Swiss-Prot record:
Gene for this chain: fam50a-b
Disulfide bonds: none
Compositionally skewed regions (Basic and acidic residues) per UniProt: 172-181
Biological role stated in the UniProt entry: Probably involved in the regulation of pre-mRNA splicing.
PANTHER family: PROTEIN FAM50A, XAP-5 PROTEIN-RELATED
Name of the featured protein: Protein FAM50A-B
GO cellular component, one term: nucleus
Organism: Xenopus laevis (African clawed frog)
Region (Disordered) location: 1-25, 125-181
Membership in a protein family: Belongs to the FAM50 family.
Entries under Pfam families matching the protein: XAP5
Main location: nucleus
Domain of life: Eukaryota
Keywords: mRNA processing, mRNA splicing, Nucleus
Any GO BP annotation: chromatin organization
Length: 343
């Protein structure tokens, strides 16, 4: 005999509708979260730009070795900015591709849901079987999409080609960038080798121990040596002849070159590379000529230089109001001496 199943079928249909509504609510929440994330990304555009230039500045500092000219620094900075912009453009293109793929999957998911809703069955057993089959189909489709994605990309790459008449130098090109990076690295290594060769060259430095009168000595140093290393060697030579230096240390000595007090951490290489100048002569020459202030035309710049003075700091503190110590002032790399002075 046929049995009455009205109540059971109604209950099954109600359960199915509740499940569908719950799924729709979850999808709506996911869409809201996605929109909120996109808004956050748009709001942080300024931060990305600031981070971009901070990264360029950091890269410029780390890749700069020793002192370089202003033109070299500008060229290096422009190259780093261009490279950084190319990297950001690649990232943006990759993000756009991901968003497009997500939107495509979302559209397919919505179509599938509409199809499911339209084909609802009031038979509970049939609904459960359909759900199992559909979930399996979705998983298979998702796996198939992931497998087909590289194939589609390959097909697009095969179909698209570059027009030889169009300038594409502004577009990202992995091969070209790798070649540029390789050349840049070769140039950097070659430049470093040249600088190391310059630093290892020997120079003869004439200096004068100044205690109110001059006592000249000479010493051989390398261009890469620091002022502190030079003073240490000079102190070893002078201790034999001057008793006040026997208990003195390097930190108690000062090096005066062209009326400028040179800090201990600078090297001779720094002044040679930058062609630095002092108040009364060039800082990049360490041999000695006649006093440039006694030549016929002192307004004409020459390469002649004076013997640098090695002075006890205690002597300077006592006599800094008296010539020649009254002319001395700390070396400032930002200050330019366009003309030599005698007062």
């Amino acid at each position: 005999m046929a049995q009455y199943k009205g109540a059971a079928s109604e209950a099954g249909r109600a359960m199915q509708l509740m499940k569908k509504r719950e799924k729709q609510r979850e999808q709506l929440e996911q869409m809201k979260l996605k929109i909120a994330e996109e808004n956050v990304v748009k709001a942080n555009i300024n931060k990305k730009f600031s981070a971009h230039y901070d990264a360029v500045e950091a890269e410029l500092k780390s890749s700069t070795v020793g002192l370089v000219t202003l033109n070299d620094m500008k060229a290096k900075q422009e190259a780093l900015v261009k490279e950084r912009e190319k990297q950001l453009a690649k990232k943006e293109q990759f993000k756009d591709l991901q968003l497009k793929l997500e939107k495509q999957r979302e559209r397919e998911r919505k179509k599938e849901q509409k199809r499911k809703i339209a084909s609802l069955s009031f038979n509970l057993e049939e609904d459960e079987e359909c759900e199992d089959e559909e979930s399996e189909e979705e998983e298979e489709e998702y796996v198939a999409d992931k497998e087909d994605l590289p194939k589609k990309k390959k097909k697009k790459k095969q179909q698209l080609g570059k027009n030889p008449d169009v300038d594409t130098s502004f577009l990202p090109d992995r091969d070209r960038e790798e070649e540029e990076n390789r050349l840049r690295e070769e140039l950097r290594q070659e430049w470093e080798r040249k600088q190391e060769k310059i630093k290892s060259e020997e120079i003869e430095i004439t200096f004068s121990y100044w205690d109110g009168s001059g006592h000249r000595r000479t010493v051989k140093m390398k261009k890469g040596n620091s002022i502190q290393q030079f003073l240490q060697k000079a102190l070893e030579i002078l201790r034999k002849d001057f008793s006040e230096l026997r208990s003195a240390g390097v930190e108690q000595l000062m090096y005066i070159k062209e009326d400028l007090i040179i800090p201990h951490h600078h090297s001779f290489y720094d002044f040679i590379v930058t062609k630095a100048r002092g108040k009364s002569g060039p800082l990049f020459n360490f041999d000695v000529h006649e006093d440039v202030r006694l030549l016929s035309d002192a307004s004409v710049e020459k390469d002649e230089s004076h013997a640098g003075k090695v002075v006890l700091r205690s002597w300077y503190e006592k006599n800094k109001h008296i010539f020649p110590a009254s002319r001395w002032e700390p070396y400032d790399p930002e200050k330019k001496w366009d003309k030599y002075t005698i007062r």
